[in-house]
Amino acid sequence: MSSAAENGEAAPGKQNEEKTYKKTASSAIKGAIQLGIGYTVGNLTSKPERDVLMQDFYVVESVFLPSEGSNLTPAHHYPDFRFKTYAPLAFRYFRELFGIKPDDYLYSICSEPLIELSNPGASGSLFFVTSDDEFIIKTVQHKEAEFLQKLLPGYYMNLNQNPRTLLPKFYGLYCMQSGGINIRIVVMNNVLPRSMRMHFTYDLKGSTYKRRASRKEREKSNPTFKDLDFLQDMHEGLYFDTETYNALMKTLQRDCRVLESFKIMDYSLLLGIHFLDHSLKEKEEETPQNVPDAKRTGMQKVLYSTAMESIQGPGKSGDGIITENPDTMGGIPAKSHRGEKLLLFMGIIDILQSYRLMKKLEHSWKALVYDGDTVSVHRPSFYADRFLKFMNSRVFKKIQALKASPSKKRCNSIAALKATSQEIVSSISQEWKDEKRDLLTEGQSFSSLDEEALGSRHRPDLVPSTPSLFEAASLATTISSSSLYVNEHYPHDRPTLYSNSKGLPSSSTFTLEEGTIYLTAEPNTLEVQDDNASVLDVYL
């Protein structure tokens, strides 16, 4: 499925322009779809319900609808055509799994004319949307329809295990035959609701090779941008609360592994972004063609069809991203890197591409010219890993838990420093008390040492006594362990040492001259921050 056609916008002012597909007018295709589905679903309701068997996946029912009508079919003004239904019982089970009742299915498709979307895909497929905005109908190629038939048993098993998925939800596969032309169509879920304006739409593959919207695409009213455009516009990515982010990545990982097991690659993530802040400021002009059927929009008929349901999200507004709003249409709440509130709508599209021989050849010749890891077409395992890495690292990001503000940190650190400093001061004060008492006790020995030194000056025949190495080491240890600090602003050329001891301020001086240590003490006139401080000067 092409992302360009998923914008959910009908062609404004071009209702009279008739398009053709395989030389068949689009109006004839729409009419045949409604007539054929109306007949086959109505006929299926008469069959008893039973378990799906393996052979049911390969059953093809056919009915001929002539323009003049028949006993089983109504008359119509389109050319005669034959309508085929593939695996009707299997698809009936799929519809029941998603809560789609036969009456609702018929009402959505057959009650009102189908709306043709203005943006056809690169493959030239036609896209129609039902008037109630529930279903997308797309024309597919023969190989795509054939691949979907082969995929059905595994698809059935996967849906049983995980009905909540971002993979396309297929509700029917049909074929219209007229004039020797086969037109195959598939009915799927509508990823982007038309009633919610998409300010940006992206088709993301995780590739960089030619992944930028063309000039022609950019000129459209609602262009679909690509990977390089996203990296330029949303370079910081999209942010989710932790719970939503984990649910989204878990769903993407599981879906990619399923596609890898089916050898599917070249798929895309169709991403629609709605800015809530913009929608509050702007008044969107809605015409009856852009507004879904008011009779049916009171409730969502299809289960697991919204983006929020598809990722197993709880539907809560995490981390204050978005307030409870009934008009969110099931979008996933997120924020831009600028803090803007967003609603995201997404789904994996274009899964009917298997890694067949032609794709292998396409990758081979592209890899010869360009970097093989950057091209879109790649082997399924590498494609899945690259796709997930791109989504996880460049597109979707988790909002980190709020950290404490700097002011709070500063207050806490100051309080801690105050408490620590009080403990240190108290400890130093007690230590200095003890050491001061010891120094005063030892002062007498220093006094006698002074007298001996003075006497030696008058008696040159005597050699001044010097303290032993043990005493000198003891003194050095006492001074170094006293937790002193230096005041460089002391008005002398010598450094001054302080301690926080109680008592009157005083100054004591140790002087080493000619191998003799002198201790002098004098009152301290220096203003110290602590009233109970004393000064100890050491001159060496």
From Swiss-Prot:
Q: Does the keyword Lipid metabolism apply?
A: yes
Domain named PIPK: which ranges? 25-395
Coiled-coil annotated residue ranges, if any: none
Q: Where is this region: Disordered?
A: 1-21
The keyword Membrane appears for this protein = yes
GO BP terms, alphabetized: phosphatidylinositol biosynthetic process; phosphatidylinositol phosphate biosynthetic process; regulation of phosphatidylinositol 3-kinase/protein kinase B signal transduction
Give GO terms: molecular function aspect only.
1-phosphatidylinositol-3-phosphate 5-kinase activity; 1-phosphatidylinositol-4-phosphate 5-kinase activity; 1-phosphatidylinositol-5-kinase activity; ATP binding; phosphatidylinositol kinase activity
Q: Where in the cell is it found?
A: Cytoplasm, Cytosol; Cell membrane; Endomembrane system
Q: In which tissues is it expressed?
A: Detected in heart, pancreas, brain, kidney, skeletal muscle and lung.
Q: Give residue numbers for the modification (Phosphoserine).
A: S445, S447, S448
Checking InterPro entries in the record gives: PInositol-4-P-4/5-kinase_C_sf (IPR027483), PInositol-4-P-4/5-kinase_core (IPR002498), PInositol-4-P-5-kinase_N (IPR027484), PInositol-4/5-P-5/4-kinase (IPR023610)
List its EC numbers.
2.7.1.68
Keywords of the record, alphabetical order, are: ATP-binding, Cell membrane, Cytoplasm, Kinase, Lipid metabolism, Membrane, Nucleotide-binding, Phosphoprotein, Transferase
According to the UniProt record, one GO cellular component term is: endomembrane system
**What Pfam families does UniProt report for this protein, alphabetically?**
PIP5K (PF01504)
Put simply, this protein is called: Phosphatidylinositol 4-phosphate 5-kinase type-1 beta
Q: Please report the organism this UniProt entry assigns to the protein.
A: Homo sapiens
